[in-house]
UniProtKB/Swiss-Prot annotation:
Enzyme Commission numbers on file: 2.5.1.115
Signal peptide: none
Protein's UniProt keywords contain Transmembrane helix: yes
Organelle targeting sequence: 1-65
Lipid bilayer topology: Multi-pass membrane protein
Keywords for this protein: Chloroplast, Membrane, Plastid, Thylakoid, Transferase, Transit peptide, Transmembrane, Transmembrane helix
GO cellular component entries: chloroplast thylakoid membrane
Listed name of the protein: Probable homogentisate phytyltransferase 2, chloroplastic
One Pfam short name: UbiA
GO BP term, pick one: vitamin E biosynthetic process
GO molecular function: homogentisate phytyltransferase activity
Encoding gene per record: HPT2
Heme as UniProt keyword: no
Top-rank EC class of the record's enzyme: transferase
Length: 379
């Protein structure tokens, strides 16, 4: 059995010898080979640390590594944060802002016209309606991204599916949840007519993107769908639902008729100019748009011209119907917005229609869209 015992370690043997007063035993076996001069000099410069010191160094290293791991972000929290960011980008925030501002402005207008009927119950119902509209918006823009992955890798690589931040399976789950949640809210809180309008909007958003229809391939059909959903259905539907919640039958007011016509034409401009930043990818995948057919410059001038005509018409309406509109708001606001689009078009021309300049021009059009709804309750 003695032959199976391990020989004592040098440090342990030395320690035992020092306590007993006897010299340390010499280990059996051949003597170690002589060290080379290079190793000898290295050993002289860097003497070995004692065994206890080495053991404590290993413990310190483990402790430091453990502290460094604890200081880093937890994997679950980082995953949830990334998922939240991807879902937010998946919703296309600029479209949500337009939907939210439009619905809030129209509800505010209906309440301004009937202040005696305001009660707190309407606030909750309006909130449900806003959530349903955002869900519908999320479904439409989400289904479009699912079927535009290859094109978005060229035109919009920052979108979550194209960037690989969101899987197609997760995207499908989100759009189904959006559609189901929005439909459930509308069915349980609003009447059959509003439910029918909501389903019509979802249907138009579906045939806009989904094969075999995919009407976005045809410029005229795409323009009509966008103008109908964002222009007519949103404004008419929200105003109708608000009056119904107030216990009133539907009746057009001059300001609501104005904003419906104005925004419908504005949505047509958005539909025309939305393809300007996407010309590169559309040409690569042979998607026919007005921008690929007529050129970026011509479409930019067409969109700006339609907006200027829209603003001129708004100013004319203020003069022709002073009893229905506040001229002191309508005239200066729309004149300033018209000057803004003229200036932005000039900036685009000076920039020689670079991709960054085109994107800035398109964002400015959306800002004008938001501005119209912000000022609408005041007109």
């Amino acid at each position: 059995m003695a032959s199976l015992a391990s020989p004592p370690l040098p440090c342990r043997a030395a320690a035992t010898a020092s306590r007993s007063g006897r010299p340390a035993p010499r280990l059996l076996g051949p003597p170690p080979p002589p060290a080379s001069p290079l190793l000898s000099s290295a050993s002289a410069r860097f003497p070995r640390a004692p065994c206890n010191a080495a053991r404590w160094s290993r413990r310190d290293a483990v402790r430091v590594c453990s502290q460094a791991g604890a200081a880093g972000p937890a994997p679950l929290s980082k995953t949830l944060s990334d998922l939240k960011d991807s879902c937010w980008r998946f919703l296309r925030p600029h479209t949500i802002r337009g939907t939210a501002l439009g619905s809030i402005a129209l509800v505010a207008r209906a309440l301004i016209e009937n202040p005696q009927l305001i009660n707190w119950w309407l606030v909750f119902k309006a909130f449900y309606g806003l959530v349903a509209l955002i869900c519908g918006n999320g479904y439409i823009v989400g289904i479009n991204q699912i079927y535009d992955i290859r094109i978005d890798k060229v035109n919009k690589p920052y979108l979550p599916i194209a960037a690989g931040d969101l899987s197609v399976q997760t995207a499908w789950l989100l759009v189904v949840l959006f559609a189901a949640a929005g439909f459930s809210i509308v069915v349980t809180n609003f009447g059959p007519f509003i439910t029918s309008l909501y389903c019509l909007g979802l249907f138009l958003g579906t045939i806009y993107s989904v094969p075999p229809f995919r009407l976005k391939r045809y410029p005229v059909a795409a323009f009509l769908i966008i103008a109908t959903v964002r222009g007519f259905l949103l404004n008419f539907g929200v105003y109708y639902a608000t009056r119904a919640a107030l216990g009133l039958t539907f009746q057009w007011s001059s300001p609501v008729a104005f904003i419906t016509c104005f925004v419908t034409l504005f949505a047509l401009v958005i539909a025309i100019t939305k393809d300007l930043p996407d010309v590169e990818g559309d040409r690569k995948y042979q998607i026919s748009t007005l921008a690929t057919k007529l050129g970026v410059r011509n479409i930019a001038f067409l969109g700006s011209g339609l907006l200027i005509a829209n603003y001129v018409a708004a100013i004319a309406v203020a003069f022709l119907m002073p009893q229905a509109f506040r001229r002191t708001v309508m005239v200066p606001v729309h004149a300033a917005l018209a000057v803004g689009i003229i200036f932005q078009t000039w900036v685009l021309e000076q920039a020689k229609y670079t991709k960054d300049a085109i994107s800035q021009y398109y964002r400015f059009i959306w800002n004008l869209f938001y501005a119209e709804y912000i000022f609408f309750p005041l007109i």
